[in-house]
């Protein structure tokens, strides 16, 4: 009889424990939905925060609004360059001769000269760190024969990714009518670029040099200051034009989680950086990624 009583008491204690477990599970599910109740990017036109491995949106503001995105455009160009390298169509060591058209590009640049020869690796470094317009046009011409043909590849990539609010007119992101994207589309583009792990070898570097063994040695400083001043940040792409204002696609990794933060239309670089860091802080402080063990993998033996 005593034994039966003990069993009944044990079952009674189990019931509230099970109920609490269900309540906790529901709370966890609520945490997985995007939270727009707080304004993390008050000054931005639009933006979002995404968990990279799942693509889950944690926070968003006007994510589908079509806006100018400046040099964040180059993330698609970078993707195409990396795809061509992975397919063996071009090599990092290939030497590209710079055309007058590429050398004459304005805006951010590494000051290429007409007829100058530079490796694909150094041109890609110039694109990734200095957001160089002359370098991206030189690579566009090397791959497709002309920037116009290369932009067709960029727009095809956009269609391949299923994006509805993006259209490109050039490879640089310089202001042009009909050239636009959205925070959501930029998030997907950034996520796709990060599938090519080679990108982080370039985007994570804060300073480097081009033409290092020549009298024209050129100091490169990453336009994305977060890679130096935010723990875990290792990319990805800045942007700034009159129409786009100040923009940033940032990525950072802490523990098992990588986040992608997009901010568009900020008034200045300082606010852009601070609001991007606020987005990342929010994600890392409130979200967790659980890594599931593989099927049949032994977690712990019970003795």
Spans of features found by a protein language model:
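Active-site-adjacent loops and short helices of periplasmic peptidoglycan-processing enzymes
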Residues: 21-184, 188, 193-197
């Amino acid at each position: 009889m005593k034994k039966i009583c003990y069993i009944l008491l044990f079952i009674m204690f189990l019931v509230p424990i099970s109920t609490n477990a269900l309540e906790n599970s529901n709370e966890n599910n609520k945490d997985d939905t995007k939270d727009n109740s707080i304004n993390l990017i008050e000054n931005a036109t639009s933006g979002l925060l995404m968990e990279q491995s799942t693509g889950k949106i944690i926070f968003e503001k006007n994510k589908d609004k079509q806006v100018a995105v400046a040099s964040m455009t180059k993330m698609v160009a970078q993707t195409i360059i990396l795809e061509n390298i992975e397919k063996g169509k071009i090599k990092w060591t290939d030497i590209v001769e710079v055309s007058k058209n590429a050398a004459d590009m304005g805006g951010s640049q590494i000051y290429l000269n007409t007829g100058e020869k530079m490796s694909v690796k150094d041109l890609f470094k110039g694109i990734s760190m200095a957001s160089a317009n002359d370098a991206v046009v030189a690579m566009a011409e090397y791959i497709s024969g002309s920037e116009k043909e290369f932009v067709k590849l960029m727009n095809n990539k956009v269609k391949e990714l299923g994006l509805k609010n993006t259209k490109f007119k050039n490879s640089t992101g310089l202001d042009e009518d009909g050239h636009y994207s959205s925070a959501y589309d930029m998030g997907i583009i950034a996520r796709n670029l990060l599938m090519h792990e080679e990108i982080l070898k370039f985007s994570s570097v804060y300073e480097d040099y081009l033409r290092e063994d020549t009298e024209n040695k050129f100091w490169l400083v990453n336009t994305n200051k977060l890679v130096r001043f935010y723990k875990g940040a290792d990319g990805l792409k800045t942007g700034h034009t009159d129409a786009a204002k100040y923009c940033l696609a940032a990525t950072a990794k802490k523990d098992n989680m990588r986040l992608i933060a997009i901010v568009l239309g900020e008034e200045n670089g300082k606010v852009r950086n601070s609001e991007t860091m606020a987005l990342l802080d929010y994600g890392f402080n409130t979200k967790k990624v659980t890594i599931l063990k593989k099927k049949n993998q032994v977690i712990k033996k019970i003795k």
